[in-house]
């Protein structure tokens, strides 16, 4: 088959419609623009909030992609927003400390952790600086495709392109239209609550001195974790800015309430007898609407395909493979999707767009699916620890896993290396065997990344 060079003139530029202005959509826009494709992005909301939600971590396998944006310009832009997550200090509910552990793959110089809203806003501003057309308040109400093009319907108008990328997130309406599939839910028996506190909330409250006070400000920022029966609590600090975000996973006995105070009351009920209960309550009580999320944790059955029947439309990111927060890879896998898609379109060229999307799916589908499995495995591993005496005997059991096949992976190098092999397998009707997953195709707790 013919592999195209990166150079393209106006008539050969691939026109791409991207739906959704989250991490997946913005990464796809930036990556595709960087490969010379013509991109337009549609988002139903009328504005972006500069700060929203809790924190999100991008692992080294995604950061190696965004590190190239503007020859490092983007990473310099977000550096002031980053939390230092080099280490984790872990204790149990009695106050017993298991020690401090290195956080591989998310540490300084490898990955980064920021407020979710701030990351999306920074990506949006960077994309706009590149001249990428972004249309806010433009809800996509329909999708369509022919053998030669694909498009969307916005405000009653049909807009055409060579392909459509649906990156609408976990609640995507386009997923069913494009793939003909519903993402089935299976509850895990657990729920999670998360919150973000900035200096406007924390700076005047002495009750938070135990985590952000002057004495603590001298200490190194890190991730603090507490393990207890049926509850796991974590706090990540940015002491120089008086900021933190927290995360609590708990059994369904603490099912999220309809209001913030009700949810927190239920969590505190599950933390009866905890040595740090009163301290953690001071953090949770500062939760505000717009910066607090509480949800039942459910796994989503993998989609059989991410493609439309004529293969000119594809779903990526959470719309395709939403993972539990415990995977630590939701945003990172979206970036891998985006980078792989851009390269496949570059190599296939305008005449083989359908093949490019098919190769993207082949290179990414199984990998994303196993990462989804990992989210559940990590959640169950953390939540099912009930023998705390055994943990004291071997504290390394509480170390966060860091599999090399996930965190040390270079999705761009892999896409360039494997494109022809995957394309020929598709054209010949043969199975493509990916090499970016464990040999047995299963997730396991590994501690071997750089």
Curated annotation (Swiss-Prot):
UniProt pathway: Alkaloid biosynthesis
UniProt entry tagged with the keyword Manganese: no
Protein name listed in UniProt: FAD-dependent monooxygenase okaB
Reactions mediated catalytically: cyclo(N(8)-(alpha,alpha-dimethylallyl)-L-Trp-6a-(alpha,alpha-dimethylallyl)-L-Trp) + AH2 + O2 = okaramine C + A + H2O
Similarity remark: Belongs to the paxM FAD-dependent monooxygenase family.
InterPro entries given in the database record: FAD-bd, FAD-dep_Monooxygenase_BioMet, FAD-dep_OxRdtase_2_FAD-bd, FAD/NAD-bd_sf
Protein localization: Membrane
Organism whose genome encodes this protein: Penicillium ochrochloron
EC assignment: 1.14.99.-
UniProt entry tagged with the keyword Transmembrane helix: yes
Membrane topology listed for this record: Single-pass membrane protein
Pfam families linked: FAD_binding_2, FAD_binding_3
GO MF term set: FAD binding; monooxygenase activity
Record's function text: FAD-dependent monooxygenase; part of the gene cluster that mediates the biosynthesis of okaramine B, a prenylated indole alkaloid that possesses an unusual octacyclic ring system, including a four-membered azetidine ring and an eight-membered azocine ring, and that exhibits insecticidal activity against silkworm larvae. Within the pathway, okaC performs indole 2,3-epoxidation, facilitating the formation of the hexahydropyrrolo[2,3-b]indole (HPI) moiety of okaramine C.
Transmembrane feature ranges: 14-34
Binding residues annotated for FAD, in chain numbering: 43, 116, 318, 331
UniProt keyword terms in alphabetical order: FAD, Flavoprotein, Membrane, Monooxygenase, NAD, NADP, Oxidoreductase, Transmembrane, Transmembrane helix
């Amino acid at each position: 088959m013919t592999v195209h060079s990166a150079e393209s003139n106006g008539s050969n530029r691939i026109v791409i419609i991207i739906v959704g202005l989250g991490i997946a959509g913005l990464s796809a826009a930036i990556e595709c623009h960087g490969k010379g494709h013509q991109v337009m992005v549609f988002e139903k909301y009328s504005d972006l909030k500069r700060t929203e939600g809790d924190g999100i971590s991008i692992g080294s396998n995604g950061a190696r992609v965004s590190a190239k944006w503007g020859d490092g310009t983007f990473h310099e832009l977000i550096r002031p927003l980053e939390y230092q997550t080099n280490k984790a200090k872990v204790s149990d509910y009695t106050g017993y400390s298991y020690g401090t552990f290195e956080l591989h793959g998310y540490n300084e110089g490898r990955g980064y952790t920021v407020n979710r809203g701030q990351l999306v806003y920074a990506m949006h501003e960077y994309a706009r600086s590149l001249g990428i057309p972004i249309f806010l308040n433009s809800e996509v109400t329909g999708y369509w495709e022919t053998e030669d093009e694909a498009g969307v319907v916005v405000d009653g108008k049909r807009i055409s392109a060579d392909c459509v990328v649906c990156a609408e997130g976990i609640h995507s309406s386009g997923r069913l239209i494009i793939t003909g599939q519903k993402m089935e839910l299976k509850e895990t028996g657990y729920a999670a609550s998360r919150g973000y506190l900035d200096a406007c909330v924390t700076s005047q409250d002495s009750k938070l001195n135990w985590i952000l006070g002057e004495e603590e400000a001298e200490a190194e920022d890190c991730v603090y974790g507490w393990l207890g029966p049926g509850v796991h609590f974590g706090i990540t600090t940015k002491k120089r800015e008086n900021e933190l975000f927290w995360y609590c996973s708990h059994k369904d006995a603490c099912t999220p309430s309809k209001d913030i105070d009700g949810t927190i009351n239920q969590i505190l009920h599950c933390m009866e007898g905890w040595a740090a209960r009163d301290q953690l309550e001071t953090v949770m009580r500062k939760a505000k609407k717009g910066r607090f999320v509480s949800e039942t944790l459910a796994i989503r059955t993998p989609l059989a395909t991410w493609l439309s029947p004529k293969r000119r439309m594809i779903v990526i990111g959470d719309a395709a493979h939403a993972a539990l927060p415990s995977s630590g890879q939701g945003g990172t896998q979206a970036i891998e999707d985006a980078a792989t898609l851009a390269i496949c379109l570059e190599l296939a060229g305008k005449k083989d767009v359908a093949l490019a999307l098919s190769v993207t799916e082949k290179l990414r589908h199984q990998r994303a699916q196993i990462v989804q499995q990992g989210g559940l495995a990590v959640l169950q591993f953390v939540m099912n620890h009930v023998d705390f005496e055994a943990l004291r005997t071997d504290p390394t059991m509480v170390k966060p896993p860091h599999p090399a096949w996930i965190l040390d992976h270079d999705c761009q190098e892999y896409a360039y290396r494997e494109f022809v092999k995957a394309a020929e397998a598709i054209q010949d009707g043969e199975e493509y065997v990916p090499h970016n997953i464990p040999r047995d195709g299963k997730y396991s707790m590994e501690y071997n990344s750089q």
